[in-house]
């Protein structure tokens, strides 16, 4: 019987003898700010990457695509704006009296400094952006799922959400694959393309990770499909 794989990252990091898990803010904070109802969804990188995961996500991509957002009705905007960080629709459910018993997992606003909730697309909604009063864009969901920016999703925004949120995260799939290879052959393969850690900070990368630079030749171990 194969041994259980050893954890490499956790929310509590050094307390458990692991690297600290990547937070949602470390995954998406370098993406361009986008307004409600953005339909084109193609942007230049207008910020420098501050964390290793952002550096890895940008490798091989000259711009940001699939960064589209939905138009929200005034009623939906009222709901979104009423949800504080780390909470969900339970904060307003008595007011709107909907899905009171059957579904209470929607309208969740992610906390910035912990790993993201599982990305989902259901009933026309996904998680709320930590700071902005809108749902996450498909590209933000893709970052959370560990799709690099060069991976472009085709179809409508709704189809993009469905593709991304129903997918097995690529880095998770790679970790499974590497462990299966280890069990079958004994070969050790590091599934982590970068030593991602919440201890990373902008001092490590500022000034040398602008993806528009021709000198940006960071290593990458994940190419899709694989």
Regions found by a protein language model. Give the residues of each.
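Flexible, glycine-/basic-rich loop-and-beta segments that form/coincide
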Residues: 1-42
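C-terminal target-recognition/interaction regions appended to catalytic cores
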Residues: 33-226
